């Protein structure tokens, strides 16, 4: 199984890249995670937000693979404990399909993407900045793996 995080946003600050890399480098090859950056749609004072979301959606749809399990990080998704995430990851691994985790832009995901998802996952009821979401997601994926592997990181 290969995990890919398709995330709207490019050119993250160095502290984000370092934080994400710190967790992802600890994962074994059979639980590897790839970050795929999607260029954000143009936003500004007179920007058409719907058009920006559609552009981001087009880019994400182009990156999705046919047999991938698609999971959206969405405000209306289910709240998972670390144990639930680990159980889901174990199921994904046993299923054998690759997994794409979708992280939308500041205005959310294109509805066309949401019609393709198999699960919706909410990281928090809080509003989180996108750079922090990447680090939090990387850490939780690492923590889920440690739980499955019996590693002492998760206590």
Curated annotation (Swiss-Prot):
Transmembrane segments: none annotated. GO terms for cellular component: cytoplasm. It catalyses: pseudouridine(1915) in 23S rRNA + S-adenosyl-L-methionine = N(3)-methylpseudouridine(1915) in 23S rRNA + S-adenosyl-L-homocysteine + H(+). GO terms for molecular function: rRNA (pseudouridine-N3-)-methyltransferase activity. The keyword rRNA processing applies. InterPro entries: Alpha/beta_knot_MTases, RlmH-like, tRNA_m1G_MTases_N. CDD domains: RlmH-like (cd18081). Coiled coil: none annotated. The keyword Methyltransferase applies. Keywords: Cytoplasm, Methyltransferase, rRNA processing, S-adenosyl-L-methionine, Transferase. Its EC number is 2.1.1.177. It is found in: Cytoplasm. It comes from the Bacteria. S-adenosyl-L-methionine binds at residues 73, 104, 123-128. Pfam families: SPOUT_MTase. HAMAP family: 23SrRNA_methyltr_H. Specifically methylates the pseudouridine at position 1915 (m3Psi1915) in 23S rRNA. Homodimer. Belongs to the RNA methyltransferase RlmH family. This is Ribosomal RNA large subunit methyltransferase H. It comes from Chromohalobacter salexigens (strain ATCC BAA-138 / DSM 3043 / CIP 106854 / NCIMB 13768 / 1H11).
């Amino acid at each position: 199984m290969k995990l890919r995080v398709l995330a709207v946003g490019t050119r993250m600050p160095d502290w984000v890249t370092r934080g994400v890399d710190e967790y992802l480098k600890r994962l074994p090859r059979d639980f590897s995670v790839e970050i795929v950056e999607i260029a954000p749609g143009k936003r500004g004072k007179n920007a058409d937000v719907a058009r920006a979301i559609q552009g981001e959606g087009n880019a994400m749809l182009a990156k999705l693979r046919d047999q991938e399990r698609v999971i959206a990080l969405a405000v209306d998704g289910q709240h998972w404990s670390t144990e639930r995430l680990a159980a889901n990851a174990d199921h994904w691994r046993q299923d054998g399909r690759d997994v794409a985790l979708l992280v939308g832009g500041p205005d959310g995901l294109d509805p066309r993407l949401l019609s393709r998802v198999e699960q919706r996952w909410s990281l928090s009821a809080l509003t989180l900045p996108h750079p922090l979401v990447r680090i939090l997601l990387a850490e939780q994926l690492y923590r889920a793996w440690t739980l499955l592997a019996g590693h002492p990181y998760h206590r």
